[in-house]
Amino acid sequence: MKIGILLGSFDPIHIGHIAIVSKVLNEGLVDKVLFLPAVQNPWKHRKAVSVDLRADMIRTAMYESGFEMNQFNIEIVSRQNKDGNYYTFDQLEALKDIYDKDIEFVILGGTDTVKDMSKWYRGEELLKNWKTVEISRPGFSSEISDMSITVSSSAIRNLLRNNKIPLPWITRGTWEIIEENRLYRD
């Protein structure tokens, strides 16, 4: 079985993420997609919404979009490094302990993300030991060239801060979780 690992904050999940999952599953690039939400991105100073709430938003958005449980999973790996950070390298290594040895993992990342991975904690080792599939982002070319998604989680958060409704860029269920918990209003 080949599992695609979709890295990101998913703060919040949006239609771009859902389109990526649909594309890689429909094209047979992977058999299942595993969301690996960042516990806390060391590059971002803004504190993310709790990882549990983000997992609820992911689960809700995926079900609302017609995906079944056997097509995706959400893994919250909070393996903290000795310096107190949660690095992608450590999270990915933890997955090897959780899943069967015969699973083939593929990192699904935006072209900009994959390009910057070498700068990450143990990034060269990560790129050497993990296969990647690049997904196009505006201004970049990639293996999946027709996936240029112009929506971003930060744009959605900005809409919410300005009391705008971010539909149709998020699912209705995601919107309800955001409203119920008064998220992104700061």
Task: Label the model's feature ranges.
Residues M1-D186:
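Nucleotidyltransferase catalytic core that binds NTPs
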